[in-house]
Amino acid sequence: IRSDLSEKVLAVGNSEYETTYTIVPTIMTVYRGYAWADIQIGITPVRFVTTHLESLWDENEIPNAAKQARQLIADLKDTKNPIVIMGDFNSDPRDPRIKDDPNAGGQPTASAACPGGTSVCNAYLLMREAGFKDVGPNALDPINNTWGMNALLTGPDPDRLKYSQQ
């Protein structure tokens, strides 16, 4: 934060998710977590949270991103101030993909552990069910992707502020 605004920072913190992903057992484990800051905006303190949920997943298992989203929701449940969460959720509203659905990105696929069309294995839907609002335009419309070539070619979404104020 800019030095002239440092007095607006009320508190900061971070946490590590309990769920990790081990690529090479005992040698390489991927740890993820989140950082937060309570910042005075006008007369209201607002908690800003940034995170990067796990992208890797194992077939017929609940993706770590969903487990991490559950922990994030639980960790924030007693926060009294407004909350803004941002980051890379590595989740798509269509996950887990039903067999034969387009899945060019290798997203989680439906299985006994992860039924399609539910939030059981979907970090995005878990956050929505917990009451968080997606301030971007329709996440199912590929034109609104905020990653990949579309974002690189077209730049930031000019309508994001408008959607957040609705």
Where are these predicted regions, by residue range?
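Second-shell loop/turn segments in exported
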Residues: V24, S55-I62
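Structured beta-strand-rich core segments of catalytic domains in phosphoester-bond hydrolases
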Residues: I1-L53
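Metal-dependent phosphoesterases centered on the DNase I-like endonuclease/exonuclease/phosphatase
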Residues: N60-Q166
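Short, glycine/serine-rich, charged loops/turns that create anion-binding
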Residues: L53-S55, N90
